[in-house]
Amino acid sequence: RAIILVAGRGSRLPKKLSLNPKSFLKIGDQTIIEKLIKNFHQSGINKIALVTGYKRYKFKKFCLKTFHNEKWKKTNMVFSLNKANSWLKRYKCIVSYGDIFYEKKALKNLLVNKGSISVSYDPFWKKLWKKRFKKVLDDAETFRIKNKNILEIGKKTNKINDIQGQYMGLIKFEPRGWKKFKACLKNDFDNKFSNLYL
């Protein structure tokens, strides 16, 4: 199964473009959300759910299962993800940001990975960041791994050695992994995810 997080508005977009959810941006002849759904279908994943928020009615045309984050203005992606708890605690789920592109190989690698939580990342992130920003550390976050385990992720840094890659916005949870995730972050869950991001 797949869960696509589309609750956010896309606050960094120009006002004209933010009239629609961010995932409705068109690249070529398809919107981002259309491309994501197509990628999942082509990979054999037909049970797809959307976690909606901003302008939820726009997504009705896709005729997909939806979970709604009514507090989308004040909460973050982890809060949105927990809205799909009924799926995550029972099924293996690929979770995707609703505004990303990735090679099908990244999705395939996640599907065959045996870990209870599997995170996709780009080890060649610097090439893209150099195109996007004047300084390569602008908007980059820590990503440190050892023995296939993540030691640190998602913090600001001024040290290039703290960044072994960048999280791609694509992650797989097995039910046992989701259970561990919730247990580790119990305090954040209890505090409405005030300081936690995915």
Predicted regions and their residues:
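N-terminal nucleotide-binding beta1-loop-alpha1 segment
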Residues: 1-17
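Short catalytic helix/loop segments, enriched in acidic residues and glycine
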Residues: 18-34
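A short, N-terminal amphipathic alpha-helix
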Residues: 30-47, 83-87
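Acidic donor-binding segment of Leloir-type glycosyltransferases
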Residues: 50-66
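Conserved core of the sugar-phosphate nucleotidyltransferase
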Residues: 62, 104-184
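Short phosphate-binding loop-to-helix
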Residues: 63-94
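The conserved acidic donor/metal-binding loop of glycosyltransferases
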Residues: 98-100
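Catalytic core and acceptor-binding pocket of nucleotide-sugar-dependent glycosyltransferases
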Residues: 190-198
